[in-house]
Amino acid sequence: MSLKIVTAAFFSAALGLSAADFDASKLPPVSAKQGVTYEKDIKPLFERSCFKCHGPEKQKAKLRLDSLEATLKGGSNGAGFEKGASAKSTFVASVARLMSDDENMPPEGKGQAFSKEEVGLLRAWIDQGTK
């Protein structure tokens, strides 16, 4: 499978445009932490795991995660999640590694995978309104 096809397939899924199903009951629980913000809590995770392909220098599928505004805008196909609905997000499912191997993010060898606790923190940020 070509890299372009794999990349397109992932971003369609990650941006919520795929009919791909995932079992939301397998998502790590939402973090109990209150007041989760992009700058303080989420940006450091993205910087560590996502900026290599979705940062200031490179934006695969036009997805940029290095600012709150860009993250909320999403990539080529729009935002990857709906505020308040982390359990429905294929973006969350992809970093939780619940999608197919070519849809899970970050890809093997491209960044550090999110821990269950970090996925829970991402879920809390989305559920608390993405501030």
Features from the language model and the residues they span:
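Aromatic- and Gly/Pro-enriched helix-to-coil junctions and flexible linker segments
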Residues: 18-131
